[in-house]
Amino acid sequence: NGQALAKSSDEKYDVALSGGSTPDVLFRLWANEYAHTTPWKKFRFFWVDERCVPPTDDASNYGRFKVLLSDSVPELKEGENVFRIIGEASPEAEALRYSELVRSQVRQFDCVILGIGNDGHTSSIFPGQEHLLTAPQPYIPSVHPITDVKRVAMTGKPMMHAKQTIFMITGSGKANIINRIINDGLDCPSSR
């Protein structure tokens, strides 16, 4: 990214990564095509959301990043330029810890990459939970309304105040929800 290269040598490019399968394409592209040309030391990676599972669980957003990208890029180091949401911790405690971490490390995200679920959710904020978008803290605990899986989710303020907020939408399975948002005016977390 040109913006990352344009920053002074000590400035970092802070990216918040979406979860689910959305960023897999990006991770594979980086690992296979740009692993040796990306200035990794200039990037700091944070997460938009995480399921409350350990990183070894297939459902872990950080776990996917680790397997698909960071395991093959030695410059990506947890605690240095990779800051995961600790999914195996209590969601309430982790939302507080991660909120404080982000407040202390990131004035403003350079880029927030969001996905969209087939139901219109983003950042583990589901339809009917739109009030969580206006929570005062950067991260909050959330719960999937059907599976009851606990999660930690970024709220609306960091998304809206990022220098760039990108919805990365892949696959024909997303066409219906995109059509409903754009053409039918569906009100859901992703449309706000």
Question: Which role does the model predict for each range below?
Answer:
Residues 157, 163-192:
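ATP/nucleoside-binding phosphotransfer catalytic cores, i.e., glycine-rich phosphate-binding loops
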Residues 95-96, 123-128, 177-181:
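A short secondary-structure junction signal
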Residues 29-39, 63, 67, 127-136, ...:
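A glycine- and small-aliphatic-rich helix-loop capping segment at beta-alpha/alpha-beta transitions
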Residues 111-157:
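Class I SAM-dependent methyltransferase SAM-binding "motif I" and its flanking Rossmann-like core
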Residues 38-113:
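Ligand-binding beta-strand-loop-alpha-helix segment within the catalytic cores
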Residues 9-34:
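Glycine-rich N-terminal segment of FAD-binding domains in flavoprotein oxidoreductases
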Residues 17-22, 114-118, 170:
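Glycine-rich beta-strand-to-loop/alpha-helix junction loops that act as flexible
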